[in-house]
Amino acid sequence: LLMMHSEAHISTVMSPVPLTTLIQERMAALEPLASGRRIEFEFIADDEIHITGIRERLVSLIDNLIENAVKYSPEGGRIEVQLQSRDKSAQLRVSDAGPGIPVELRERVFDRFFRDPNQTQSGSGLGLAIVKAVTQQHNGRVNLSTSAEGGLMVTVDFPNPAFA
């Protein structure tokens, strides 16, 4: 699995992926994980947005983002997933009200197996490394910031062929 995500160039053919629908499908699949901790999902999206990509890898990216948000959110919290068309890109944002990631660690959390030493949650340290690898494979960018709730907001920008 790790090797699959660490390839710099993808040999698999990319095709149009209905990103809005894919995110809705993944949120529905991960709903039991969230409801077990009384966490609410909120999805805000423009109309269907298509990007050129590899569906299976995008599933991995979406699942890692949402699973991390659920893991670090307080019980009874809310996770906001937002998808918008931006300047020549499709922008995916996942925000939670968890502890966030200190600014000084934000670049390092993309390294494989790196974990915030102050975190008590268990994990492999691969989630955000996979997110970054898949984002790069799709010629995108990923950025971490503080959410409005004080947790983490992960922003992924994908090139949108509709604007190319």
Regions from the PLM with identified roles:
Residues G76-K88:
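Short beta-strand/loop element within the Bergerat-fold HATPase_c
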Residues A69-V70:
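Short helix-loop "hinge" at the ATP-lid/N-box region of the Bergerat-fold HATPase_c
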Residues I101-F113:
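Short conserved segment of the HATPase_c
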Residues S15-P16, S35-G36, E40-I49, E56:
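Conserved catalytic submotifs in the C-terminal HATPase_c
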Residues E7-V13, H50-G53:
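Conserved micro-motifs of the catalytic ATP-binding
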